[in-house]
C-alpha cells in the first residue's frame, strides 16, 4: 500500500456510532488552509478555539472546539487539525466530506501513526503499542502497552543495539590491526561484554514473553467423552452459564468459546463436542471441528470421570493427542468419591483432580495454566510485545550465542563480527531502524482508521 507523505489526510478519529463528542482529524500541509476555510481563521497553536464549522456556502455544519498543532510539534510531525463536534454519524460524515472537498484525502487505517513513525515522532514498537493500548482487554495489558508507548521496550532494545555496535567496533579494530602485540580478542573484555549482552537479552526476552501473553493470551481446548463435564468446566472458568449442561450425552455439538482472564492473562477456552463414534450428522461435524481446534491449541485439557477407571475410549483420546501440544489430564467429579482437590506430576505429565460442578480445585487448574505458560503476576518491567518481537529477540540471542562459541572455541574474530552484525540487525527490526516496506504495510493496516 502506498502511503504518501505529501498528502493531507483526514479521518473520523472517534469510534463509529452515536456519542457526545466526535472528532475529525486532519494531518498534512493543507491542514492550516483547511482550518481557515472551515473556521474562518487558523486557530492559535495548541489553544482550544470554540466556534462554528462552516460549509462551502458559509452555512454552519456544526459547532465545537478546534485544535491546531503546527509541525513538527504534533503527533504526526506534520500540521494537525482536530475538529471536535457532536458525535452523530451524519454530522461527522458531513464535516469529513467538507474537509475532503478542501483538498484532503481519506486516510488509510493506521496512516496517522505511520506518518508519526516516518517523521521520527515514535518508533515501530511504540506505534504498535498504540494499537495494543486501544485493544487491551485488561488493566494489566493496558499498563504494559502504555509502558511500550512511553518507550520502555524501545529503550531496552536500543541499549542492546548500542552495546552490540560498541563491541563490533572493538572486535573489528582487533581484526584490522593484527600486528598489535596485545591480542584484544583473548584479553577477556570481549568475552565479558558478550556475557553481559546475553544476560540482558534473556531479561528483555522474559519480559517480552510476558507481554505477548498479556496481548494474545493462551488457547485452551477442553476434550473428553460425552458427559465428562467439559461444559461444566467451561462454565466454572467463565463464571457464567456459557454452555448448556444436561445429563444427556452429546448436548454440546459445536465449539463453544469463552474469553476469560486469569489475573490479567487472557484465556481463550474452547468447549468441544464429546469425542465418540457419532451417527448424527450434526454431531459428527462438531467432532470434526473439535479435532481441528486441537491443532491450534496451546494446551489441551482431557477430561475423565474421577469416579471410574480410565475408560478405553479415554485412553484412545489421549493416544491421539499431537505430541507437540502439552496435555493436562483432568479427573472431574471428585465430589462423587469424596476426594480432595489435588495436582500431581508424573514423568512430566500433569493430572488435576477437581469438581467443575462444585468449583473444587479450580484454583489449582488456574495456577497450573499460569505456570505452564510462564506467566508471572507482576507488572514491574513488563511491556507489551508481539510475536514478531519475540522472533527478533530469539534471533538476536541465537547470533550472540553463536558468536560466543566462535570466540571461545575458534577465536574467529571475523565470524564473531558477522554474528554481532546479524544480532544488531534483528534487534533493529523491532524499532523499525531496519524494516521492510512490506512489514510496515502489514503493521499499520491492522490499525483502526483515525490512528
Curated annotation (Swiss-Prot):
GO MF: GTP binding; GTPase activity; metal ion binding
Keyword Ribosomal protein assigned: no
Protein keywords: Cytoplasm, GTP-binding, Hydrolase, Magnesium, Metal-binding, Nucleotide-binding, Potassium, tRNA processing
A single BP term in Gene Ontology: tRNA wobble uridine modification
Residues the record lists as binding K(+): 227, 246, 248, 251
Any single Gene Ontology cellular-component annotation: cytosol
EC code(s) of this entry: 3.6.-.-
Cofactor(s) for this UniProt protein: K(+)
PANTHER family per the UniProt record, alphabetical: TRNA MODIFICATION GTPASE GTPBP3 (PTHR42714), TRNA MODIFICATION GTPASE GTPBP3, MITOCHONDRIAL (PTHR42714:SF2)
Protein name (Swiss-Prot/TrEMBL): tRNA modification GTPase MnmE
Organism: Hydrogenovibrio crunogenus (strain DSM 25203 / XCL-2) (Thiomicrospira crunogena)
Lineage: Bacteria, Pseudomonadati, Pseudomonadota, Gammaproteobacteria, Thiotrichales
Amino acid at each position: 500500500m502506498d502511503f504518501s507523505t505529501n498528502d493531507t489526510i483526514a479521518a473520523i478519529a472517534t469510534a463509529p456510532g452515536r456519542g457526545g463528542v466526535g472528532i475529525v482529524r486532519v494531518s498534512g500541509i493543507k491542514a492550516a488552509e483547511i482550518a481557515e476555510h472551515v473556521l474562518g481563521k487558523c486557530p492559535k497553536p495548541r489553544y482550544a478555539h470554540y466556534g462554528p464549522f462552516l460549509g462551502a456556502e458559509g452555512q454552519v455544519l456544526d459547532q465545537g472546539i478546534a485544535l491546531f498543532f503546527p509541525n513538527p510539534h504534533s503527533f504526526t510531525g506534520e500540521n494537525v487539525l482536530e475538529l471536535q463536534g457532536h458525535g452523530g454519524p451524519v454530522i461527522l460524515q458531513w464535516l469529513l466530506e467538507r474537509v475532503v472537498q478542501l483538498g484532503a484525502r481519506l486516510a488509510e487505517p493506521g496512516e496517522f501513526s505511520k506518518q508519526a513513525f516516518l517523521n521520527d515522532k515514535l518508533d515501530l514498537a511504540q506505534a504498535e503499542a498504540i494499537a495494543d493500548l486501544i485493544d487491551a482487554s485488561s488493566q494489566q495489558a493496558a499498563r504494559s502497552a502504555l509502558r511500550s508507548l512511553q518507550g520502555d521496550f524501545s529503550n531496552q532494545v536500543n541499549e542492546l543495539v548500542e552495546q552490540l555496535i560498541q563491541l563490533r567496533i572493538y572486535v573489528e579494530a582487533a581484526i584490522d590491526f593484527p600486528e598489535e602485540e596485545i591480542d584484544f580478542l583473548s584479553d577477556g573484555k570481549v568475552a565479558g561484554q558478550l556475557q553481559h549482552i546475553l544476560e540482558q537479552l534473556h531479561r528483555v526476552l522474559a519480559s517480552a514473553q510476558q507481554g505477548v501473553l498479556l496481548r494474545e493470551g493462551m488457547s485452551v481446548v477442553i476434550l473428553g467423552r460425552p458427559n465428562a463435564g467439559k461444559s461444566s468446566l467451561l462454565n466454572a472458568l467463565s463464571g457464567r452459564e456459557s454452555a448448556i449442561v444436561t445429563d444427556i450425552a452429546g448436548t454440546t455439538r459445536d465449539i463453544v468459546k469463552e474469553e476469560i482472564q486469569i489475573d490479567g492473562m487472557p484465556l481463550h477456552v474452547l468447549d468441544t463436542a464429546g469425542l465418540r463414534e457419532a451417527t448424527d450428522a450434526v454431531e459428527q461435524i462438531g467432532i470434526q471441528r473439535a479435532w481441528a481446534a486441537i491443532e491450534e491449541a496451546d494446551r489441551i485439557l482431557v477430561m475423565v470421570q474421577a469416579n471410574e477407571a480410565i475408560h478405553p475410549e479415554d485412553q484412545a483420546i489421549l493416544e491421539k493427542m499431537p505430541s507437540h501440544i502439552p496435555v493436562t489430564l483432568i479427573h472431574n467429579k471428585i465430589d462423587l468419591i469424596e476426594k480432595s482437590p489435588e495436582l500431581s506430576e508424573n514423568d512430566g505429565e500433569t493430572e488435576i483432580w477437581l469438581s467443575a460442578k462444585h468449583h473444587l480445585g479450580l484454583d489449582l487448574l488456574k495456577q497450573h495454566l499460569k505456570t505452564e505458560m510462564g506467566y508471572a503476576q507482576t507488572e514491574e518491567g513488563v511491556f507489551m510485545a508481539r510475536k514478531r518481537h519475540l522472533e527478533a529477540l530469539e534471533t538476536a540471542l541465537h547470533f550472540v550465542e553463536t558468536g560466543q562459541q566462535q570466540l571461545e572455541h575458534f577465536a574467529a574474530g571475523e565470524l564473531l563480527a558477522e554474528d554481532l552484525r546479524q544480532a544488531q540487525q534483528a534487534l533493529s527490526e523491532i524499532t523499525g531502524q531496519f524494516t521492510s516496506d512490506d512489514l510496515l504495510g502489514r503493521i499499520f493496516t491492522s490499525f483502526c482508521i483515525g490512528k
